[in-house]
Amino acid sequence: MTMMFDLTQDLVKEILSRVPITSLGAVRSTCKGWNALSKDRILCKAKPKQQFHQGFMLSDYRLRSMRFNISGTFKENGEEFVNLSVKEIGNFLNKVEISHMYYCGGILLCVTTDTRLVIWNPYLGQIRWIQLKTETMYSTFCLRYDNNKNHKILRFLDNKQGSYEIYDLKSYSWRAFDVIPKWDIDDDGQSASVKGNTYFRTIDETPNLLICFDFTAERFGKLLDPPFQHGWMSLSWVREEKLVALYQHLDTSMIEIWITTKIEPNALSWTSFLKCYIEQLIALDFWFDIDYNNFFIDEEKKLAVVIDKVESEDCKRSNSHINSYIIGDDGYLKKMNSLGNTARSYTAIMLSSCYVSSLVQIDDPIARRRRRERNSKRKEKKRKGTTNNKV
């Protein structure tokens, strides 16, 4: 019988590359070698043969992990092939209703329907509940880190225009600051975090303008132009290094996707990544629901995956279908696997397609000390039991 230590290192790396997000923590406890290799994966030292897009999706106020492989979109015989799976997360997060979620460098910020905040590191299995400084009916949040890799939460207080708060995970404290804005932030979730900064879509006389919040300087930049003005726009990102914008024309069947070649707090340069006329969209009177970050791209394959909600044609049914589509050049549109159903009143959100595990400790020092003490007691009890058995 083949034992774990009989496996070659290349085979182990390939196995680790296929481990679901929510199971990474269990790998660490298998053996010291696997723990070390899993850390290599986190530090991007190990490159699997097949590149999987991993991320999270929210529907019906429940968080789900998502795994998508489009590196094998076509088999050698020309037959189309896509490996897609969505899995419910069976931990404490499915015991609460989640209205929004935000991702940054392997850390998730979840907002419950009763406006409680919880930070989660899926790899380490650590959580932290965060007490709000100011109680309001509605708020918009985002999660990012500064140049020193200190994670921070930016909160927009909707009851006071121009009022914001910042939570520092290192100091466990909120700070308030006021800005006199000439714009309003779009509160429908349209933002993307790249290189330590977050770019928001603004609501102004000119639609689709962007503005950056610098988490190191803790200030907003100037208004930035996207590569287009009119139509429906959704934002995404690539490896937290490039900003991506999907633009859907209002009066034609054209879909455009642009990607940044230069990205700074006060300057953006764009290049066209994909442009296609999808005639069947007009024929079907169909438009992608892109109110949220629900698409991602594969630069190598020059394809985009869009997650979309389609309302049921049966008026007696309250559910809508969540579908996935692959779009490419020359009008290529392919409907892929169904991702299940969701309540009509809430749109599914595609959070991130480039999840990378993190070793950042997010639980508080007291909880960490108690955990170490429990582990130490278990080891001591096990050692004494082993000694007694030998006697």
UniProtKB/Swiss-Prot annotation:
Q: Which domain of life is it from?
A: Eukaryota
List all membrane-crossing ranges: none
What segment(s) does the record annotate as region Disordered?
369-391
Alphabetical list of InterPro entries matching this protein: F-box-assoc_dom_typ1, F-box-assoc_interact_dom, F-box-like_dom_sf, F-box_dom, SCF_F-box_component
The residue range of the signal peptide is: none
Q: Where is the composition biased (Basic residues)?
A: 369-385
NCBIfam families (alphabetical):
F_box_assoc_1 (TIGR01640)
State the protein's name: F-box/kelch-repeat protein At4g05080
- Provide the species name: Arabidopsis thaliana
